[in-house]
């Protein structure tokens, strides 16, 4: 919808050499950037899912590491405690009465730490699961960025990691000479605890820009916005795609009867939900209707109103942050794919 609205507002930018809708998501970024952004990998795939009702089977499926689950369970169940023997040596003692962990065990903080320990011990095997996905994404973005030295990647937010991971892959994994500038709707807020400053350094050096608010811009909005109250999800719903969230990039061999035996990139999206897609279309039809009214303004009127501040935009959506409205809108989300 951002691409559609931008092209309506600036028809001269409508060509594919100027703007293009591209596939990317925090799920894809987390997998593809795991080698360098290990902390983010475990935070998103493990620690954010603690005590949320996810089973170990679901967690490993989400990471696309299902074949490593059995080995991890064996490692967890065979884990033992260490005791001091009294003469300075350490001896291993099996924990008495310990209940065996199964694939249907719910993820807790204790189990998450043990899974992280196991995956770190087998880190190269983890990365090898995403090797072909990194190659496939490189094929895709190699075509998208061909002939470009500097591009802006527009994203909702919030830590700005999407553009950061993409920049790392472009330079260090795929060897492309292109600079990425992240354009965010909003950054992490004061309610993000230790991660509230994530985007600030990048903004300071001009690698990211935030429209709605930041620590130095509309600070009252920065203090109001709270992911724990669903505020992130409201914005993501407004700007989400009707075709489903990106699951990842995959290499696929072309059939011999389809023009050759080459390898090409297959883009996989989340499960298409007609109900959610219909709601998204309705919401975004309103956005496009507004753009049509905007473009109908006379040049003089348009010049007066050309700057719509981030505060004004947030004020309209803030109504949806009311508890009753928020609960109704949350029923529409594909939280797993966002």
Residue ranges of predicted features:
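Conserved beta-strand -> loop -> alpha-helix junction used to position metal-binding or nucleic-acid-contacting
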Residues: 12-32
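Intrinsically disordered, low-complexity regions enriched in small/polar residues
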Residues: 8, 12, 23-25, 38-44
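Short, surface-exposed basic-aromatic patches at helix termini and helix-loop junctions that form
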Residues: 3-17, 167-176
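Long, contiguous domain-sized segments
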Residues: 20, 30-63, 67-338
């Amino acid at each position: 919808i951002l691409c559609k609205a931008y092209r309506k507002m600036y028809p001269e930018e409508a060509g594919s050499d100027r703007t293009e809708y591209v596939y990317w998501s925090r799920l894809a970024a987390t997998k593809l950037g795991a080698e360098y952004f290990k902390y983010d990998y475990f935070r998103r795939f493990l620690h954010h899912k603690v005590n949320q009702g996810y089973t170990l089977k679901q967690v490993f499926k989400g990471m696309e590491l299902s074949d490593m689950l059995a080995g991890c369970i064996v490692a967890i169940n065979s884990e033992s405690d260490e005791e001091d023997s009294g003469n300075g040596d350490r001896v291993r003692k099996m924990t008495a009465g310990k209940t065996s962990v199964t694939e249907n065990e719910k993820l807790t903080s204790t189990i998450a730490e043990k899974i992280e320990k196991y995956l770190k011990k087998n880190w190269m095997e983890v990365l090898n699961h995403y090797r072909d996905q990194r190659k496939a994404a490189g094929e895709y973005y190699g075509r998208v960025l061909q002939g470009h030295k500097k591009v802006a990647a527009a994203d909702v937010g919030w830590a700005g990691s999407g553009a950061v991971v993409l920049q790392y892959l472009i330079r260090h994994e795929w060897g492309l000479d292109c600079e990425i500038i992240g354009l965010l709707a909003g950054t992490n807020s004061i309610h993000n605890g230790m991660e509230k400053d994530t985007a600030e350094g990048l903004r300071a050096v001009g690698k990211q820009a935030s429209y709605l608010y930041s620590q130095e811009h509309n600070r009252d909005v920065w203090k109001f916005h709270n992911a724990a109250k669903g505020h992130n999800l409201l914005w993501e719903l407004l700007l989400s795609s009707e075709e489903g969230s990106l699951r990842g990039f995959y290499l696929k061999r072309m059939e011999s009867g389809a023009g050759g035996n080459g390898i090409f990139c297959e883009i996989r999206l989340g499960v298409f939900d007609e109900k959610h897609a219909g709601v998204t279309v309705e919401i975004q039809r309103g956005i496009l209707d507004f753009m049509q009214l905007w473009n109908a303004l006379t040049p003089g009127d348009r010049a007066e109103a050309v700057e719509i501040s981030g505060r004004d935009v947030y004020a309209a959506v803030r109504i949806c942050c009311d508890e009753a409205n928020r609960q109704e809108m949350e029923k529409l989300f594909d939280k797993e794919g966002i």
